[in-house]
Amino acid sequence: MARKKKTRRITDIMPIRKADKKIDITKARSGKKLTRYELDAKAREDKKKRKHKGLASGSRHSAVEEKANKLQNEIKDPKIGSKKKIPLVVEFVNKPEKGQVIPVIKQVKKQDPMKELENLENNEILNELLDALDAGKTISKSDQQFVDECLDRISELMEELGIEDEDESEDDLYRTFERMDINQFR
Protein backbone atom coordinates (compact mmCIF):
# COMPACT_ATOMS: atom_id res chain seq x y z
CA MET A 1 0.00 0.00 0.00
CA ALA A 2 1.33 3.39 -1.04
CA ARG A 3 2.01 6.03 1.53
CA LYS A 4 -0.11 9.16 1.63
CA LYS A 5 1.58 12.46 2.21
CA LYS A 6 0.11 14.38 5.12
CA THR A 7 -1.43 17.71 4.30
CA ARG A 8 -2.36 20.62 6.48
CA ARG A 9 -5.53 21.42 4.60
CA ILE A 10 -8.69 21.83 6.59
CA THR A 11 -11.26 19.29 5.54
CA ASP A 12 -14.71 18.34 6.66
CA ILE A 13 -13.25 15.84 9.13
CA MET A 14 -11.17 18.32 11.08
CA PRO A 15 -12.82 20.89 13.32
CA ILE A 16 -12.54 24.51 12.16
CA ARG A 17 -10.57 26.83 14.38
CA LYS A 18 -11.80 30.37 14.86
CA ALA A 19 -8.48 31.64 13.54
CA ASP A 20 -8.96 29.76 10.24
CA LYS A 21 -12.41 31.21 9.60
CA LYS A 22 -12.46 34.09 7.16
CA ILE A 23 -14.20 36.91 8.92
CA ASP A 24 -15.72 39.56 6.76
CA ILE A 25 -14.63 42.78 8.40
CA THR A 26 -17.50 44.72 6.90
CA LYS A 27 -19.94 42.25 8.46
CA ALA A 28 -18.25 42.65 11.82
CA ARG A 29 -20.24 44.44 14.41
CA SER A 30 -20.75 47.98 13.29
CA GLY A 31 -20.20 50.62 15.93
CA LYS A 32 -18.67 48.15 18.41
CA LYS A 33 -15.07 47.33 19.11
CA LEU A 34 -13.60 44.46 17.04
CA THR A 35 -12.88 41.21 18.87
CA ARG A 36 -9.40 39.72 19.09
CA TYR A 37 -10.17 37.17 16.34
CA GLU A 38 -11.46 39.87 13.98
CA LEU A 39 -8.41 42.05 14.62
CA ASP A 40 -6.09 39.10 13.92
CA ALA A 41 -7.88 38.31 10.65
CA LYS A 42 -7.67 41.94 9.57
CA ALA A 43 -3.95 42.05 10.39
CA ARG A 44 -3.34 38.86 8.38
CA GLU A 45 -5.10 40.33 5.31
CA ASP A 46 -3.09 43.54 5.58
CA LYS A 47 0.14 41.55 5.86
CA LYS A 48 -0.72 39.56 2.71
CA LYS A 49 -1.28 42.80 0.83
CA ARG A 50 2.01 44.28 2.02
CA LYS A 51 3.93 41.12 1.24
CA HIS A 52 3.17 41.28 -2.52
CA LYS A 53 4.39 44.76 -3.35
CA GLY A 54 6.78 43.94 -6.19
CA LEU A 55 6.14 42.88 -9.74
CA ALA A 56 4.70 39.47 -10.45
CA SER A 57 7.13 36.69 -11.32
CA GLY A 58 7.92 36.45 -15.02
CA SER A 59 6.92 40.06 -15.56
CA ARG A 60 9.34 40.58 -18.44
CA HIS A 61 7.50 37.91 -20.43
CA SER A 62 3.98 38.98 -19.56
CA ALA A 63 4.70 42.63 -20.43
CA VAL A 64 4.81 41.76 -24.14
CA GLU A 65 1.44 40.04 -23.89
CA GLU A 66 -0.08 43.08 -22.21
CA LYS A 67 1.08 45.30 -25.09
CA ALA A 68 -0.50 42.91 -27.57
CA ASN A 69 -3.72 42.95 -25.54
CA LYS A 70 -3.70 46.76 -25.52
CA LEU A 71 -3.36 46.81 -29.32
CA GLN A 72 -6.29 44.43 -29.69
CA ASN A 73 -8.38 46.54 -27.32
CA GLU A 74 -7.63 49.66 -29.34
CA ILE A 75 -8.70 47.95 -32.55
CA LYS A 76 -11.90 46.65 -30.97
CA ASP A 77 -12.88 50.10 -29.70
CA PRO A 78 -16.20 50.82 -31.48
CA LYS A 79 -15.85 54.57 -31.15
CA ILE A 80 -12.76 54.66 -33.32
CA GLY A 81 -12.91 53.97 -37.04
CA SER A 82 -15.72 53.03 -39.34
CA LYS A 83 -17.11 49.64 -40.25
CA LYS A 84 -18.02 50.84 -43.72
CA LYS A 85 -15.94 49.13 -46.38
CA ILE A 86 -13.99 51.47 -48.62
CA PRO A 87 -13.42 50.42 -52.25
CA LEU A 88 -9.77 50.36 -53.28
CA VAL A 89 -10.58 51.02 -56.94
CA VAL A 90 -12.57 54.13 -57.81
CA GLU A 91 -15.38 53.41 -60.24
CA PHE A 92 -17.40 56.11 -61.98
CA VAL A 93 -20.08 54.45 -64.05
CA ASN A 94 -22.60 57.13 -65.04
CA LYS A 95 -23.05 58.19 -61.44
CA PRO A 96 -23.24 61.95 -60.95
CA GLU A 97 -21.57 63.44 -57.93
CA LYS A 98 -23.66 64.59 -55.02
CA GLY A 99 -25.14 68.01 -55.61
CA GLN A 100 -24.99 67.66 -59.40
CA VAL A 101 -28.19 65.72 -59.85
CA ILE A 102 -30.21 66.50 -62.95
CA PRO A 103 -33.85 66.97 -61.96
CA VAL A 104 -36.30 64.71 -63.73
CA ILE A 105 -38.93 66.64 -65.67
CA LYS A 106 -42.35 65.24 -64.98
CA GLN A 107 -44.42 64.95 -68.11
CA VAL A 108 -48.01 65.87 -67.52
CA LYS A 109 -50.31 63.59 -69.45
CA LYS A 110 -52.39 65.71 -71.77
CA GLN A 111 -56.05 64.97 -71.56
CA ASP A 112 -58.14 64.67 -74.67
CA PRO A 113 -59.18 68.25 -75.55
CA MET A 114 -62.83 67.25 -75.91
CA LYS A 115 -62.90 65.64 -72.45
CA GLU A 116 -61.05 68.58 -70.91
CA LEU A 117 -63.54 71.03 -72.43
CA GLU A 118 -66.43 68.92 -71.14
CA ASN A 119 -64.90 68.82 -67.64
CA LEU A 120 -64.41 72.60 -67.60
CA GLU A 121 -67.98 73.23 -68.74
CA ASN A 122 -69.34 70.87 -66.07
CA ASN A 123 -67.15 72.31 -63.29
CA GLU A 124 -69.56 73.14 -60.44
CA ILE A 125 -67.29 75.69 -58.78
CA LEU A 126 -66.81 77.57 -62.04
CA ASN A 127 -70.56 77.53 -62.71
CA GLU A 128 -71.34 78.87 -59.21
CA LEU A 129 -68.80 81.68 -59.61
CA LEU A 130 -70.18 82.60 -63.05
CA ASP A 131 -73.73 82.65 -61.63
CA ALA A 132 -72.53 84.93 -58.80
CA LEU A 133 -70.92 87.29 -61.35
CA ASP A 134 -74.11 87.32 -63.45
CA ALA A 135 -76.10 88.19 -60.32
CA GLY A 136 -73.81 91.19 -59.77
CA LYS A 137 -72.05 89.90 -56.67
CA THR A 138 -68.37 90.62 -56.10
CA ILE A 139 -65.94 87.73 -55.74
CA SER A 140 -62.42 87.57 -54.29
CA LYS A 141 -59.28 88.09 -56.36
CA SER A 142 -58.31 84.42 -56.23
CA ASP A 143 -61.80 83.38 -57.40
CA GLN A 144 -61.71 85.96 -60.19
CA GLN A 145 -58.29 84.68 -61.26
CA PHE A 146 -59.64 81.09 -61.29
CA VAL A 147 -62.61 82.13 -63.44
CA ASP A 148 -60.35 83.99 -65.89
CA GLU A 149 -57.97 81.02 -66.22
CA CYS A 150 -60.83 78.59 -66.82
CA LEU A 151 -62.50 80.82 -69.41
CA ASP A 152 -59.19 81.34 -71.22
CA ARG A 153 -58.59 77.60 -71.30
CA ILE A 154 -62.12 76.99 -72.59
CA SER A 155 -61.58 79.47 -75.42
CA GLU A 156 -58.20 77.85 -76.29
CA LEU A 157 -59.78 74.41 -76.41
CA MET A 158 -62.68 75.64 -78.54
CA GLU A 159 -60.23 77.16 -81.03
CA GLU A 160 -58.19 73.95 -81.05
CA LEU A 161 -61.26 71.83 -81.72
CA GLY A 162 -62.66 74.30 -84.25
CA ILE A 163 -65.80 75.02 -82.29
CA GLU A 164 -67.09 78.55 -82.71
CA ASP A 165 -68.84 80.36 -79.92
CA GLU A 166 -72.29 81.15 -81.23
CA ASP A 167 -72.99 84.64 -80.02
CA GLU A 168 -76.51 85.25 -81.25
CA SER A 169 -77.30 88.87 -81.70
CA GLU A 170 -80.58 90.39 -80.59
CA ASP A 171 -81.70 90.72 -84.18
CA ASP A 172 -81.32 86.98 -84.74
CA LEU A 173 -83.36 86.24 -81.65
CA TYR A 174 -86.09 88.66 -82.80
CA ARG A 175 -86.29 87.00 -86.22
CA THR A 176 -86.62 83.51 -84.77
CA PHE A 177 -89.38 84.77 -82.48
CA GLU A 178 -91.30 86.23 -85.44
CA ARG A 179 -91.02 83.01 -87.45
CA MET A 180 -92.18 80.82 -84.62
CA ASP A 181 -95.70 79.53 -84.62
CA ILE A 182 -97.25 80.25 -81.23
CA ASN A 183 -100.01 77.72 -81.71
CA GLN A 184 -97.40 75.00 -81.54
CA PHE A 185 -97.09 75.33 -77.77
CA ARG A 186 -100.82 75.01 -76.94
Swiss-Prot record:
Is the Zinc keyword given for this protein? no
Organism listed in the record: Haemophilus influenzae (strain PittEE)
NCBIfam families annotated for this entry? Answer: PRK05244.1-1 (NF003560)
Where are the residues of the annotated region Disordered? Answer: 39-77
Write out the GO MF terms.
Answer: GTPase activator activity
Q: Which domain of life is it from?
A: Bacteria
Q: Does the keyword ATP-binding belong to this entry?
A: no
Q: Which UniProt keywords apply?
A: GTPase activation, Ribosome biogenesis
Question: How does this polypeptide assemble, per the annotation?
Answer: Interacts with Der.
- GO BP term, example: ribosome biogenesis
The protein here is known as Der GTPase-activating protein YihI
InterPro entries given for it?
YihI
Similarity comment:
Belongs to the YihI family.
Biased composition range(s): Basic and acidic residues: 62-77
Family matches, as HAMAP family: GAP_YihI
Any Pfam family: YihI
